[in-house]
């Protein structure tokens, strides 16, 4: 009888998993940068805390300011220090021009540089235009927008001498699209976007980048107080069918702070699960 046919060749090995083709390099470029957080909650909770912890995990030293460094701020300071980086909180009124100049110079003396500025403050005093008081308007603009100007103004000469720096303004999707009942908040966050774009044009030739992040519905202590029904209605409007996390925003902030975004400036990145396109 004829000999049996040779066995078929073995199948080719399967391709490597998809993620291996696009593995992200480590963000070693944050070490040993100094990051300054200007925030209504310092880096004590929510998005600010998530960004501070993410930056610290990548090796960045952390300085943050708040009107008062309370127990939350002190606890976060300890949590960041446990990651092996230098961290310090500073009590300062961000809406006061002179106070801001002093605290930024003090941070420069203590840390040696200010490489990344995160303007993360945000308060709300919502109301329809017909019922909104002047005090409601002024408070939101002062905390959300004027204090960002104060800190950028104070950090600019430091970053110019360094010939490098990354400024990250925390805006909001309502600063892009508006929202009824939030004209003061929307205006302040739209101002943060315009401020970032203008700074990017002014200081780009000095090696300084400026960008804005516009978060959508992010699950924080504030939004956790909403009813399940309200949160479900929000989720229906989001293509990814879920709210975002502070860590989602922190990942984008880390990208903008690092050299992975060295050719990215004057941009607004919406972190909203596709809610606004």
Can you say where each PLM-predicted feature lies in the sequence?
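Short, small-residue-biased leader/transition segments that mark boundaries at the very start
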Residues: 21-36
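Alpha-helical segment proximal to the catalytic Tyr-Lys
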Residues: 157, 201-205, 262
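Substrate-binding pocket helix/loop in short-chain dehydrogenase/reductase
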Residues: 128-129, 133-141, 223, 234
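Active-site helix of classical SDR
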Residues: 152, 188, 196
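Conserved glycine-rich Rossmann-like NAD(P)H-binding loop of the short-chain dehydrogenase/reductase
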Residues: 58-75
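Residue(s) in the substrate-gating loop at a strand-loop-helix junction
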Residues: 172
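C-terminal substrate-recognition "lid" of short-chain dehydrogenase/reductases
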Residues: 149-152, 208, 242-271, 276
């Amino acid at each position: 009888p004829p000999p049996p046919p040779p066995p078929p060749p073995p199948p080719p090995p399967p391709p490597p998993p998809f993620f291996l083709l696009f593995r992200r390099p480590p963000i070693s470029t944050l070490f040993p940068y100094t990051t300054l957080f200007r925030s209504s909650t310092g880096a004590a909770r929510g998005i600010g805390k998530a960004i501070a912890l993410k930056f610290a995990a990548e090796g960045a030293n952390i300085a943050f300011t708040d009107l008062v460094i309370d127990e939350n701020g002190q606890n976060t300071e300890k949590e960041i220090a446990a990651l092996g980086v230098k961290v310090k909180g500073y009590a300062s009124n961000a809406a006061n021009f002179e106070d801001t100049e002093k605290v930024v110079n003090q941070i420069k003396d203590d840390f040696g540089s200010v490489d990344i500025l995160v303007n993360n403050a945000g308060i709300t005093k919502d109301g329809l235009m017909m019922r909104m008081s002047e005090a409601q308007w002024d408070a939101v603009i002062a905390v959300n927008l004027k204090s960002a100007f104060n800190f950028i103004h104070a950090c600019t000469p430091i970053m110019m001498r360094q010939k490098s720096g990354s400024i990250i303004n925390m805006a909001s999707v309502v600063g892009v699209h508006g929202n009824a009942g939030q004209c003061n908040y929307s205006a302040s966050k739209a101002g943060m976007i315009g401020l970032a774009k203008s700074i990017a044009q002014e200081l780009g030739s000095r090696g300084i980048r400026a960008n804005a992040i516009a978060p959508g519905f992010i699950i924080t202590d504030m939004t956790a107080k909403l009813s399940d029904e309200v949160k479900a209605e929000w989720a229906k409007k989001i293509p990814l069918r879920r709210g975002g996390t502070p860590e989602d925003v922190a990942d984008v902030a880390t990208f903008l702070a690092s050299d992975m975004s060295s050719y990215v400036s004057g941009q607004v990145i919406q972190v909203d699960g596709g809610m606004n396109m």
